[in-house]
Amino acid sequence: MTSYSYRQSSAMSSFGGLGGGSVRFGPGVAFRAPSIHGGSGGRGVSVSSARFVSSSSSGGYGGGYGGVLTASDGLLAGNEKLTMQNLNDRLASYLDKVRALEAANGELEVKIRDWYQKQGPGPSRDYSHYYTTIQDLRDKILGATIENSRIVLQIDNARLAADDFRTKFETEQALRMSVEADINGLRRVLDELTLARADLEMQIEGLKEELAYLKKNHEEEISTLRGQVGGQVSVEVDSAPGTDLAKILSDMRSQYEVMAEQNRKDAEAWFTSRTEELNREVAGHTEQLQMSRSEVTDLRRTLQGLEIELQSQLSMKAALEDTLAETEARFGAQLAHIQALISGIEAQLGDVRADSERQNQEYQRLMDIKSRLEQEIATYRSLLEGQEDHYSNLSASKVL
């Protein structure tokens, strides 16, 4: 922080402003030149006014810079050369200090201008030759990202295909086990049908044996009856005609044969109808089972297709979400960096403005000091001109 001080000391003297201050001079006036100490760039500048001692002379220049000397003319005449020389030295010292202050002010202005030039925006550089490289790198990054996403998608598709094949294998294995179970069930049904057929065949064999047994008994009865008929004595009796045994036996044989044939046909018809009924039931159940299996297979395939499509969509969604998150993170970091740069530049701009305001205030203060010094120099000049006129009048009166 640049500090300026204006110090004034005197034993019995006072300086006033232009609006009505007073200046006192006395015999043996002693002046001390004002001193200016300036640091680098105008910092730490200290201005102290001249010191003079007066005992009995006073003058006022409240409005018209008029001055009255009350000291004895003899004392002034005796110290005329010394006083004038002292005043001239003090005036020269004031002028030198003013020039030094102006030089310091000029240096300060140059430094302020240099500082503004350094802090201001420099000449714009041509970065157009970097744009192609940046665009190529961005294209490569984008291509690598797309390739990575494609590879990830292929991996997911391969995983889904493997899961699909595993599911299909498990499904086919389950179907194979189901078919084997159905085959085992049909084998049990076939065994039951075989047992039923064997039972029916045994029944037919029993009926055939029974028919053979009946035929045998019938033949034995016929043989017995024939033997009985052959051993009888022919006795002619005048009676009613007897029954024809051969005809009776023939009728019985025909009846038994008809009954046996009817039983055989009934058994064959029952066996055939039962077999056909069982075959129809087996065919109906088999067809229904095949339809149910085909329907279940179609539903499973549809479910697998939907699951594969769902997994593909979920994988694509996850990949897109990852890409979106990566893009948001990258552009968020870039935005934060740009925002930090903007904040830093705004802070620097605020510092520059504050420093510029401070430099302007210091400049105004220096200009005020310069104007006051110029006013004091003008006052001294008017006083010196008044003293020279007075001394000239005194010298002329003495000569006369």
Swiss-Prot record:
Region of interest (Coil 2), residue spans: 249-387
Biological process annotations from GO: epithelial cell differentiation; intermediate filament organization
Domain IF rod: 80-391
Region of interest (Head), ranges: 1-79
Record Gene3D superfamilies: 1.20.5.170, Single helix bin, Vasodilator-stimulated phosphoprotein
GO molecular function, one term: structural molecule activity
GO cellular component, one term: intermediate filament
Residues covered by region (Coil 1B): 134-225
Key words, A-Z: Coiled coil, Intermediate filament, Keratin, Methylation, Phosphoprotein
Location of the region described as Coil 1A in the Swiss-Prot/TrEMBL record: 80-115
SMART domains: Filament (SM01391)
Rod-like helical tail: region residues: 388-400
Protein name: Keratin, type I cytoskeletal 19
Positions bearing Omega-N-methylarginine: 7, 24, 32, 43, 51
Subunit architecture: Heterotetramer of two type I and two type II keratins. Interacts with PNN and the actin-binding domain of DMD.
InterPro entries assigned to the protein according to its UniProt record, in alphabetical order: IF_conserved, IF_rod_dom, Keratin_I
Site note Stutter, residues: 267, 327
Disulfide bonds: none
Location of Asymmetric dimethylarginine modifications: 24
Modified sites of kind Phosphoserine: 14, 22, 35, 40, 57, 72, 395
Region (Necessary for interaction with PNN): 244-390
